[in-house]
Each structure stands twice: as structure tokens, then as C-alpha cells.
């Protein structure tokens, strides 16, 4: 009888010990889970990504952006990164941008070269500069590929944006943000590109043009933030194609706008559709026609839909200017 009582006591002690071990184990598991959760939350807080994925058509672009050094520089400060996404404060003004030239200078030089009041060389720093410009975008097909080509060559360009190309198109808006984020210049190519509205009877309608420019400015501000502004405009069809230029010139001066035309082009909007080799040849011909002293060239191209051959020709066009000793700059 005494032996049975002894066995029962030993059993109770063992059971109690076992329960204590179970409780300790549970406590350790819960503590580990809490600590692990805190570490994950802390790690996630310090690794905010700034990229956006409009849709599958620009996914390859997003992958390249996610691995860029610029993303790494802002990682770890979630409040600052989120602010940049909202107001695109990464878009630099002319004074802040080391890749930009003054729109007033570029506009004056280009105008003088076109109307014969200036002759090469026009720069005072001894450099040879080409300004790659793209009209009518952004497109969801060609603009992302053009951005990738420019990145590969570490070249910056100026994009003359159409308001109707981005209005109501979330993917195009994201591409515009990405264009600015990669350090390119954003300029105004009016909202509508409608010749009959802008130039009735082939005469510049100042009120309609200013209204169209301001409408485009408002749309771009909605996308890029209220701090965004651009002084650079380009008239659809160019400035010199229309009557009524005197009144338009006065309106531009009053509003602080600078029109920048072009003095070379790849002819991707001229005549029959051209392949990449023909676009390269057109570029060379229009550049060579400027003469051996040409030191400031504004090259017209397009990044809208249907300009896939422009994308294909762009690497060769960049290499052509590199071989001739040109520097690539933007216009702000």
C-alpha cells in the first residue's frame, strides 16, 4: 500500500514537471514569433520600393528600375520616398539639373539658325551639343523602350508631351512619371495637337493656343505634382509654318514660354513610313546639311504609337553623334 502511494507521488511530480516543460516551450515559441514579427516589420519599413508597375507592357522597365542605384539611395526613409512618389520632387529645375541647357539660349540659337540671322558656331563654350527631342508621347508601347535605350547609353533627352496622350490613361501617366524620374526633361506640345483648333485658316489663334498649353500644363501637374513647371513649348507643325506669329510671340513673352523648334530630324513623320536604316540615313543627311561647324543641333523624333522603327534606329543615331564628338543635353 505504501509502495502504491509512493508511485502515485512520483507520477504526480513527473506530470507536474512535464507540464512545466510544456508551458516553458510554449512561452519560448510565442516569444520567438513576436520577436520575428518585429524584425520583419522593421526590415520592411526600411525597404520601401519607389517603382510602380503600370501593367505587363512595362514590367521589364520596372525590373530595371528596381535594381537601380537611385532606388538604393532612398531606401530606408519611407516618408521621404513616399513624398517623392506623390509630388515627384525629383524633377529638377533648370538651375539644379547638370544635364540641362537654358531654353532661352537654345530657342534663340535655333531660331537664328533657321531664319538666317545666326551662323555656326553659336555656342560660346567650345562644345558640340545635340538635343534629342521626342514629340507626341508618351505612348505605352514605344516610350518605355526609348527610355531603356537612353539609359543604356547614359543619355538624357527632352520629351514634348501631349496632354491627350496622358489624360485618362493611368499607364501613360506612370510612364510620364518614370520619364521624369530617370532625369529627362518634360516639355509642352499642347493638349490637343489639333491644327484646325490651334491654327484656323493657317493662322495662329493665340487664345486657343495658350488655353491648350495651359490645359496640358494642368494635366502634367496632376501627374508630376504641383511643383512641376516647364518653360519649354513646341508648336505642332512648328512655329514657322503658320501666320500670326507676331501676336503669338508677344503672348509667349508675357507667359514666360520659349518655343524650341528643330534644325535636324530623322523624318519618322515625313512621307512614307521608313525603316530604321532609312531613319538613320535621314538623320545623317539633315545633320551633314548643317555644315562642319554645327555645334548646336536640335533633332526631332517621335515616341508616339507606330514609331517602332524610331526605337530600332535610336542606338545607331546616338552612336553616330558620339562618333562626331557631340555631347547630349536637355532643354529646360
What does each of the following model-derived ranges do?
Residues 2-10, 19-132, 139-144, 152, ...:
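N-terminal pre-catalytic segment of deacetylase/amide-hydrolase enzymes
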Residues 16:
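Short, Lys/Arg-enriched phosphate-binding patches
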Residues 27, 33, 40, 100-107, ...:
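A sequence-composition feature that detects small, non-aromatic residues
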Residues 29-30, 147, 201, 314:
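Hydrophobic alpha-helical membrane context
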Residues 94-204, 215-231:
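Active-site beta->alpha N-cap acidic-glycine motif
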Residues 171, 193-300, 304-322, 326-327, ...:
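Catalytic domains of cell-wall/extracellular-matrix polysaccharide-remodeling enzymes
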Amino acid at each position: 500500500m505504501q509502495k502504491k502511494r509512493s508511485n502515485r507521488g512520483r507520477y504526480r511530480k513527473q506530470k507536474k514537471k512535464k507540464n512545466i516543460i510544456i508551458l516553458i516551450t510554449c512561452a519560448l515559441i510565442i516569444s520567438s514569433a513576436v520577436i520575428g514579427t518585429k524584425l520583419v516589420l522593421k526590415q520592411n519599413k526600411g525597404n520601401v520600393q519607389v517603382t510602380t508597375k503600370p501593367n505587363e507592357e512595362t514590367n521589364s522597365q520596372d525590373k530595371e528600375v528596381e535594381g537601380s542605384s537611385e532606388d538604393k539611395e532612398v531606401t530606408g526613409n519611407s516618408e521621404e520616398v513616399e513624398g517623392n512618389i506623390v509630388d515627384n520632387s525629383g524633377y529638377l529645375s533648370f538651375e539644379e539639373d547638370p544635364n540641362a541647357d537654358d531654353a532661352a539660349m537654345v530657342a534663340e540659337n535655333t531660331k537664328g539658325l533657321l531664319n538666317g540671322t545666326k551662323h555656326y558656331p553659336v555656342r560660346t563654350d567650345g562644345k558640340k551639343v545635340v538635343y534629342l527631342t521626342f514629340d507626341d508621347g508618351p505612348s505605352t508601347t514605344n516610350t518605355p523602350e526609348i527610355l531603356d535605350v537612353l539609359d543604356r547609353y547614359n543619355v538624357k533627352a527632352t520629351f514634348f508631351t501631349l496632354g491627350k496622350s496622358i489624360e485618362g490613361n493611368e499607364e501613360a501617366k506612370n510612364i510620364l512619371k518614370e520619364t521624369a524620374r530617370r532625369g529627362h526633361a518634360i516639355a509642352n506640345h499642347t493638349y490637343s495637337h489639333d491644327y484646325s483648333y490651334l491654327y484656323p485658316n493657317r493662322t495662329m489663334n493665340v487664345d486657343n493656343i495658350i488655353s491648350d498649353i495651359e490645359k496640358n500644363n494642368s494635366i502634367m501637374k496632376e501627374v508630376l505634382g504641383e511643383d512641376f513647371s516647364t518653360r519649354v513649348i513646341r508648336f505642332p507643325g512648328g512655329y514657322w509654318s503658320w501666320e500670326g506669329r507676331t501676336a503669338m510671340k508677344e503672348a509667349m513673352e508675357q507667359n514666360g514660354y520659349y518655343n524650341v523648334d528643330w534644325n535636324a530630324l530623322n523624318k519618322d513623320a515625313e512621307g512614307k513610313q521608313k525603316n530604321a536604316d532609312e531613319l538613320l540615313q535621314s538623320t545623317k543627311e539633315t545633320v551633314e546639311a548643317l555644315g562642319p561647324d554645327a555645334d548646336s543641333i536640335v533633332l526631332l523624333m517621335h515616341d508616339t504609337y507606330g514609331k517602332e522603327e524610331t526605337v530600332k534606329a535610336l542606338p545607331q543615331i546616338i552612336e553616330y553623334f558620339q562618333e562626331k564628338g557631340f555631347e547630349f543635353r536637355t532643354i529646360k
